[in-house]
Swiss-Prot record:
PROSITE patterns: HSP70_1, HSP70_2, HSP70_3. Residues 609-640 are annotated as: Disordered. Belongs to the heat shock protein 70 family. This is Heat shock cognate 70 kDa protein 1. GO terms for cellular component: cytoplasm; cytosol; extracellular matrix. Residues 625-634 have a biased composition (Polar residues).
Amino acid sequence: MSSIGIDLGTTYSCVGVWQNDRVEIIANDQGNRTTPSYVAFTDTERLIGDAAKNQVAMNPTNTVFDAKRLIGRKFSDKEVQSDMKHWPFKVIPKDGDKPHIQVEFKGETKVFSPEEISSMVLLKMKETAEAYLGKTINNAVITVPAYFNDSQRQATKDAGTISKLNVQRIINEPTAAAIAYGLEKKGSGEKNILIFDLGGGTFDVSLLTIEDGVFEVKATAGDTHLGGEDFDNRLVSHFVDEFKRKHKKDIMGNQRAVRRLRTACERAKRTLSSSAQASIEIDSLFEGIDFYTSITRARFEELCADLFRGCLDPVEKVLKDSKLDKKSIHEIVLVGGSTRIPKVQQLLQEFFNGKELNKSINPDEAVAYGAAVQAAILSNEGGAKVADLLLLDVAPLSMGLETAGGVMTTLIPRNTTIPCKKTQTFSTYSDNQPGVLIQVYEGERAMTKDNNLLGKFELSGIPPAPRGVPQVEVTFDVDANGILNVSAEDKSTGNKQKITITNDKGRLSKEEIEKMVADAEKFKQQDEQQKDRVESKNKLENYAFTVKNSIKDEKVAAKISDSDKSTIESETESVLKWLESNQTAEKDEYEDKMKALEAVVNPIMSKLYQEGGMPQGGGMPGGMSNDSPKSSNNKVDELD
């Protein structure tokens, strides 16, 4: 069974598969090897990827992106609250404190969870792979930032389930990138590799050792909330201020203007990676005012100076955590599109005392590449080339439970290699205590109130005894996906309780996932129907125009009687008029119109053929013979 590797990115996603003894990164239907993580909803259809991103300025409130910045988070998170200020689409709390996205779709208000939006992007990646491989794909390895916590990982897995993918493994993005790097560089002793991954929305630094195909993550740090979009935001704010200064007008209230400016800023940022200056030219940006301006690389670097410098903090942290100094790093590998920014490269190189950075792997594709290798290993497909690779990943955050006085007692410290299992014995706090409440947290702070509650459960039925006598054995078990199971057992009675950390944190229940899978299937069918509808419409339109033009051909005009000519003219004219006012008719309406038009046209055309009035091979669609008007359906997809 083929399995694919998917890099589900904040701004762009990428898919790869192991084939012919190597990884192939698969281009989408637009020929692009990365696909925007965008989903758009219009009056007539749902668009995913390039098509969604290309119409964002016309439809900002119903075009959803950055779902990765919402997935597995709470609505009240301060990051979510601050992001919402930048998003043109509407985010609302639902089911307690879960963020959901509200859009208008086919004239109705719809509400989607971040998992559902991400599942639509995953579906697009799945379909891209299926179109290339010519078969159905069910299995995938999906990557997440190393710093994603338990709920963000679980929610990503749920998104896979909704898109009908069996998620074989969730792996960390920097680990995947290290595989991409390591596969190219096998052998040659133990190496310490620093992976510096700065993408569109997240930033990860990981330190790994690679030796004889064993990848061991020593430490990981980062910011789930720093990336190319934050640099875009700085540019947007800069130009909004400039527009205010020049024209005394604030464009912030106009979403379309802001969106057009953001697109121009993203383009300028990319230009500045290779040029010292970039110009921005936007016609009629706001209230008819053209906005022509430029920005230098130096100015851009100044606008983002604190963000760029901040990229070094996690680098220092992983060195400290893995107890290594800068000199003992053998390779610094750049991953993520934002590592193309010269200033970022310069700061990193200076930090490592001028050491050359490794740019041998494609920063946009490395993560999907590594995920595809891992997918091949898990489905026993990669053969000898990958068989001896072993991935030892780590838990990004400490996990433990609350003990008396709200103290965090850690069972699994962060950067512990996973999968792993730890057991510790606890007791009661007061005499004759009938039960204990096991509250599971993740985080690095001393008090649980400052950490993140993962879930809780009660172990009851403890026989009366003085405090400190009962023995409750608590086991933390982290699987290879970084997902935690906790169990507690009262040693005197053998009474046992356990919890898989899933739903307590605004996670999706099994029922919700099943409902979302069904919804996803429904949307997919609607997408198919929409495609069929558009094809029938285009077919009718092409046919009408071809017929209309064919009677203007001199040879035909000479042979055709005036009455036949006017019949054809009036029929095609009325069909074209009807088409103008019925752009959203159903497929069978278009087909009926087609049949009716053919019924009028065919007898006239076959009469011409018999009289030899038709030019050979091509006056009519496909050089029609009298019984095959349908040869007009050699389909050419037209672009609007």
